């Protein structure tokens, strides 16, 4: 029999083992689609970003005009820009759902895969932040000023660190230039870490909704899940295209239609919707350093999740108490997202503080406690 090139060629063999003959659990649900959706998001963002970079000028006097020029005068420039801006939102929707899936079904017990995933989330957040600054609108400028200024809360080296990051004494031309360089570089770093993420995943194989070992019942990735993924791509691209064509500025901030002006502060400085939960946690503490620590902890807490798993069952499928707690956490995050978009006044302050406290309470104390309690009830 002639050797199959797909299985013998050094490069094709890697692709074959990752995307074609990959043994996959037979019972994984649509929640397992989000990994491939994130891959498609990354490819789309890199391609649209590359096309935008060809028309963008990283200079404070030209950045805003160059974006306007791209939308007005470049063939389909408006579409590329709208896909890129809204593609970021879909990227975050997918990654949050992907993390939620991992949390619900106990996928975090594959520690290396989980930790590289958290590093990917942090890199994605950094990429989105520096990218938001590039159009050099009012919210771009003031968002950059407020968030980079947080580093000044670090004792002793803070102020030096901020001035070093700015390349001067305020957010100005050097800042914009380096942010553009970083925004160009980081997606390729994300692509590299993604390969590491997949390497670790393929060491152990995928988890499944039952949270049990599935070695006895595997099926090839192609055609079963490759087809299922194509359906996922379609279901994601349809809303993305609707958003890009019909209401491209729905998720943006109206302040960004005004060119950056260091002399005029917008009434409410707030980041894009996907950072609002963390922004609410930052604002809930009336001390600068405390707020920065809480902000960092709100994301870095994900590294602790594998160590807080006290249940004898991996998945939450058969753990109703943990399920209730999980959906309480989801509701809590939605409340934080809403609070982050509101002005700092009564009653939003106290709601934000309560929701921030509850967020850490659920993750650090209630989840391990309920896990141990369920063990007592079940075994």
UniProtKB/Swiss-Prot annotation:
It is found in: Mitochondrion inner membrane. Heme b b562 binds at residues 84, 183. Keywords: Electron transport, Heme, Iron, Membrane, Metal-binding, Mitochondrion, Mitochondrion inner membrane, Respiratory chain, Transmembrane, Transmembrane helix, Transport, Ubiquinone. Coiled coil: none annotated. GO terms for biological process: mitochondrial electron transport, ubiquinol to cytochrome c. The chain crosses the membrane at residues 34-54, 78-99, 114-134, 179-199, 227-247, 289-309, 321-341, 348-368. GO terms for molecular function: metal ion binding; ubiquinol-cytochrome-c reductase activity. Its cofactor is heme b. Pfam families: Cytochrom_B_C, Cytochrome_B. Binds 2 heme b groups non-covalently. A ubiquinone binds at residue 202. The keyword Transmembrane applies. One of its GO terms (cellular component) is respiratory chain complex III. InterPro entries: Cyt_b/b6_C (IPR005798), Cyt_b/b6_C_sf (IPR036150), Cyt_b/b6_N (IPR005797), Cytb/b6-like_sf (IPR027387), Cytochrome_b (IPR030689), Cytochrome_b_C_euk/bac (IPR048260), Cytochrome_b_N_euk/bac (IPR048259), Di-haem_cyt_TM (IPR016174). Heme b b566 binds at residues 98, 197. It is a multi-pass membrane protein. The cytochrome bc1 complex contains 11 subunits: 3 respiratory subunits (MT-CYB, CYC1 and UQCRFS1), 2 core proteins (UQCRC1 and UQCRC2) and 6 low-molecular weight proteins (UQCRH/QCR6, UQCRB/QCR7, UQCRQ/QCR8, UQCR10/QCR9, UQCR11/QCR10 and a cleavage product of UQCRFS1). This cytochrome bc1 complex then forms a dimer. Belongs to the cytochrome b family. Heme 1 (or BL or b562) is low-potential and absorbs at about 562 nm, and heme 2 (or BH or b566) is high-potential and absorbs at about 566 nm. Component of the ubiquinol-cytochrome c reductase complex (complex III or cytochrome b-c1 complex) that is part of the mitochondrial respiratory chain. The b-c1 complex mediates electron transfer from ubiquinol to cytochrome c. Contributes to the generation of a proton gradient across the mitochondrial membrane that is then used for ATP synthesis. This is Cytochrome b.
